[in-house]
Amino acid sequence: TARFPAKLVHGHIKQLVDQELPLIFYPCMTYNLDENQSDNHYNCPLVAYYPEVIAANMDLNNTKFLYPFISFDNEKNFVEKMIKAFETVDIHFNKNDVKIAFRTAMNKYRDFHEELVQKHIDAVKFAREHNLQIAVLCGRPYHLDPLVNHQINQLLTTLGFVVVSEESVPR
């Protein structure tokens, strides 16, 4: 059976379909980005292939649903798959534009993590300067959904903790 966060996807997709969007892009991703932090970088099967569950089990009305298998591990492969996938719905991209978009996204992703680490350093410094406890919240990306996380970060903050994410901790 699907875990609760996976079931939330149905509600999010329904909201998009109700807006009568012409296309929803929700790719299947066997692998997550390899951040060289573990032996592998597989996504959980439910996360990786849930777009197939949506395609097979939801009434999408007239909304096209594009769910190609993609990976960020190989730029050339990513660019080719994206171009081919969007051509199936009569959307055409220039190969060089997709390459630039890929590289820009990877750079922004790296910059985001560098900024996150700096925010962590600032938060720890603040906590030490003010003699506050630090709580590290660990979880999955879907834990950002307030329905899933029950605002535990806000609760911890009201209890006097400085809250940082697992992802922000310098490696």
Language-model segments: which ranges?
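An N-terminal assembly and electron-transfer interface module characteristic of large anaerobic redox
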Residues: 1-171
